[in-house]
Each structure stands twice: as structure tokens, then as C-alpha cells.
Design a protein with these regions (language model features):
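Catalytic domains that recognize anionic headgroups
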Residues: 1-204
Length: 204
């Protein structure tokens, strides 16, 4: 399940976005799919690669992948007087199938997830190449909100309590990697234990 009004918090009004806007940043939301726009929230970002008409009234917001690399290249090259903040949503590697009827079994789901991981790595490399080429001093944060549930047959099994250490890590692990400008890595970088409050640390 998702938090009530989660899309509105992410897309319309949240502390991180407001900090950037209040400090003169131009903000961009680029996504491979309009999942976070499904309820047509008020757009808090200055620029988005989707319009309201791109998002249907009925659907999941998932399915067809949209190009994010072309607009990213365009907007990072754009010469403006403001600093820029980009929120880029990439959906791979995702997680195992949601329901038992869709499941390929533990081994099949693991193999499929590994394929999507390879696709994600390719997209990430292309994304980082564009950013570093057009903005060499960019601070880049790569973060996942949860694990891929690899080791399970299907996602709904996460609602069954388990003490299996590997499954717990597969469900709840969040991945975080930071590219610091000019390789200037602060000493607390290695002490990150969680992605929670990561922006509070970054902007302080």
C-alpha cells in the first residue's frame, strides 16, 4: 500500500522541492512513465516531460517507456541564470511480479530481475554521461526506495512475516550512491546507514 496523498507530496509540495525553489532553482521532473502523475496532481516542478493530456484518467501509469535521455540532454545544456534541480525517475530494475498468477517462480523471477538490472545499469550510465558532460560539477544522488524482493515468488508475499535475513534485506534494502562534485567527498559519506533524511544532510 502507499501513503495517502503520496503522489501529491512527491510531485506537488514537499520540503526538498520547496528548499530548492526558495533558493532560486529551476526544477525538472523527468520520468520514464507517468506513474506519479496518475491522479493528475498539481505540478510543483517548473518542467515535466509529460503533459496532463499524456496521462489517462483510467490506468496504472505503467506500461510504455518514454525517453528521458533526450529531454535530459536538452535541459542540462540549456543556459539559464538559475541553478537546476532534476528529479529523474527510472523504473528498472523494479521488483518481482506482484501476484502469484503472474509469477515465474523464484528462479524465473530472479533471472528476469537480473535482466532488468542490466537495462537499468545501461540507462544509468547514459544518464550520468549526459549529466557529467553538460554539468561537470553536478552533485548526483542515485537512490532506490526499496529492494527488488528477489528470492520471493511474487511481491504480495512481502505481507507475510518472515525472519529470513536474506528476504528481509531484499525487501527493505535501499540503495544509495552519491557523485560528489570534483570528488570532494565529506567524511560523513561513509556513515550513511539509510536513505532517510539524505537531503537534510546534503543541504545542511
Amino acid at each position: 500500500t502507499e501513503n495517502t496523498n503520496a503522489r501529491d507530496m512527491i510531485i506537488s509540495d514537499n520540503t526538498v522541492l520547496n528548499i530548492f525553489k526558495n533558493n532560486g532553482y529551476k526544477s525538472y521532473f523527468l520520468a520514464e512513465m507517468p506513474y506519479l502523475l496518475l491522479n493528475k496532481p498539481v505540478l510543483g516542478y517548473d518542467v515535466c516531460n509529460f503533459t496532463n493530456s499524456d496521462v489517462g484518467y483510467i490506468g496504472t501509469g505503467l506500461g510504455t517507456y518514454y525517453d528521458i535521455l533526450t529531454p535530459l540532454n536538452t535541459y542540462t545544456k540549456e543556459v539559464i541564470s538559475q541553478p537546476k534541480f532534476f528529479f529523474i525517475e527510472i523504473f528498472n530494475p523494479g521488483h518481482v511480479h506482484g501476484r502469484e498468477a503472474q509469477s515465474l517462480g523464484v528462479d524465473g523471477e530472479r533471472a528476469l530481475w537480473q535482466q532488468t538490472l542490466a537495462n537499468a545499469n545501461k540507462t544509468l550510465v547514459q544518464t550520468l554521461d549526459i549529466i557529467k558532460q553538460n554539468d561537470p560539477n553536478a552533485l548526483v544522488v542515485i537512490m532506490a526506495d526499496h529492494g527488488g524482493f528477489v528470492g520471493m515468488e511474487y511481491t504480495l508475499q512481502t505481507y507475510t512475516k518472515t525472519q529470513d535475513r536474506d528476504l528481509i534485506y531484499s525487501i527493505f534494502s535501499s540503495n544509495l550512491s552519491i557523485h560528489w562534485p570534483q570528488g570532494d567527498i565529506p567524511p560523513y559519506d561513509i556513515n550513511f546507514k539509510s536513505a532517510v533524511n539524505v537531503f537534510r544532510i546534503l543541504v545542511s
